[in-house]
């Protein structure tokens, strides 16, 4: 069941759903708007000949902090990681789905490549996978609304929520745009 604005407010007021910093004006009829933080991860194209998900390529990305009042220009065909300004904490009975804002999609900005699902139990800042599919550069501004998080009531609470020891939840507690940890999905030799 998709939560309505009143259900979202109830969940926040009850302490089930955590959003920090919280701004009540971000609550929409069936979602919560998310804003972009000031940190971006750009790919170091000159350090690697290719991306190998099986390897820990520590220097694949570099962290860039945008100064106050400045924007970040995302050129056509470019891909960067960013992060929500808000930290989200989901209880074991709620799952989330991140979607882009249609106004930005109409400008050619994609908010996530494949990782739009937020597991119950997740706590942290959501990493955004931003792509410019337009034919002109797009300026990204820290604090701008970049997406919306829809929340779903599960049929029952997760038996093993994200962040519990059994799952090895590699992105639990993440802060800022977090690079891929896909290499942890491969068995050690």
From Swiss-Prot:
The gene is dcd. DCTP binds at residues 101-106, 119, 127-129, 148, 162, 170, 174. The active site is at residue 129. GO terms for biological process: dUMP biosynthetic process; dUTP biosynthetic process; nucleobase-containing small molecule interconversion. Pathway: Pyrimidine metabolism; dUMP biosynthesis; dUMP from dCTP: step 1/1. Residues 163-189 are annotated as: Disordered. This is dCTP deaminase, dUMP-forming. It holds the Pfam family DCD.
